[in-house]
Amino acid sequence: TLIKKAGKATTNIHKRAVQLIQKNGMKAKVYIITGLPGETDKSIEATKQFVLDLKPDKWICLLFTPYPGTPIFRNPDAYGVKILHKRFREYVQSYPSKSHVNLYEKETGKLLARNKDLEARFEDLYHWLNKLNPESMEYSSFNG
């Protein structure tokens, strides 16, 4: 998966970190990223279950964006990503939007971004999270 290729931590590590933070009287904020290559309705449901198990105090829901200067931006083919914009000024760091990336599945070449399935999965997760606990939302890249 993209997360493994990018060298990101596993869900078990994230869960343990949130538990330790909360156990020590601090608030845990999690970043939930959707729109990764290979994402499916099933993986969104798994993300929802993970959030239920995690019980974060705050959450931020973002659409995957390979920012200029990152390893994914510099080598998109290795991660199954196609870059839509090449200049950093075309990205809004704090609030990435659905128009910033053009993702495709490497194996099939199927376009994902600006695809109704991708947007529907993102909006489904965003609205589910907001319904779960609206006070927990700090901000999101959802703009519709």
What is each of the regions a protein language model found here?
Residues 1-143:
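A structural motif corresponding to the C-terminal lobe/cap of the Radical SAM core domain
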